[in-house]
UniProtKB/Swiss-Prot annotation:
InterPro entries (UniProt xref): Nxph, NXPH/NXPE
Source species taxonomy: Eukaryota, Metazoa, Chordata, Craniata, Vertebrata
Entries under PANTHER family matching the protein: NEUREXOPHILIN, NEUREXOPHILIN-1
Example of a GO cellular component annotation carried by this entry: synaptic cleft
V (Cys-rich) as annotated region, ranges: 186-271
Molecular function as annotated in GO: signaling receptor binding
Annotated organism of origin: Homo sapiens
Predominant location: secreted
Keyword set includes NADP: no
Region feature IV (linker domain), mapped onto this chain: 177-185
Described function: May be signaling molecules that resemble neuropeptides and that act by binding to alpha-neurexins and possibly other receptors.
Residue span of region III: 98-176
Alphabetized UniProt keyword annotations: Glycoprotein, Secreted, Signal
Pfam families: Neurexophilin
Protein name as catalogued: Neurexophilin-1
Amino acid sequence: MQAACWYVLFLLQPTVYLVTCANLTNGGKSELLKSGSSKSTLKHIWTESSKDLSISRLLSQTFRGKENDTDLDLRYDTPEPYSEQDLWDWLRNSTDLQEPRPRAKRRPIVKTGKFKKMFGWGDFHSNIKTVKLNLLITGKIVDHGNGTFSVYFRHNSTGQGNVSVSLVPPTKIVEFDLAQQTVIDAKDSKSFNCRIEYEKVDKATKNTLCNYDPSKTCYQEQTQSHVSWLCSKPFKVICIYISFYSTDYKLVQKVCPDYNYHSDTPYFPSG
């Protein structure tokens, strides 16, 4: 009698038969439904095991279909970097004291909207002129877009004097003591992750007209130096520290970029 009943249900409601068989196989706890549509029948006989199976299958299909979309959302094009020669050529054009030439058109470092640059304070320029020394320092920052950035400096001087250009934490004290200028406190080392990547100094001598008396000839020394720094996370703020010493002039200067310009979190100096 039970088999006949199942046979009638198969003819009248094949959907109910299939779901009910699955239910009996899993636990045998289902009962025959006396009335109601196939939609309400599915609602009542949907067991926990069937629910888990269907939901897991649905989730697997959903995530499997969106794997490529996630990769595409996270991927960005690699920025077009400057070559080393392009950077030094640009700095040479900027530091040419004899015949200033217009700055060549530069290629964009990154494609707009691909990722946020860490720094946006651009180029650095410092010009110092005294009776015995003419000094021009230019710098450029290049954001690589991968959590690191490089800072390039070039200095061109004519005359006698000592010049030092370096990167320091914002807590660095401005002082004339040469012995303490290169010391970085231990508490700053965690937020200052920069190192010298390249350094070169070229010197030459020549006789030119004296600045204080054009009728006389003076012995002058010409110096050109190149230095590049590579910085990476973690870091907070970096500052440019310039120390200049000559027989008639001394200067120590610390220049910090506008950190609020390139960061969502304002920087509040301390110490």
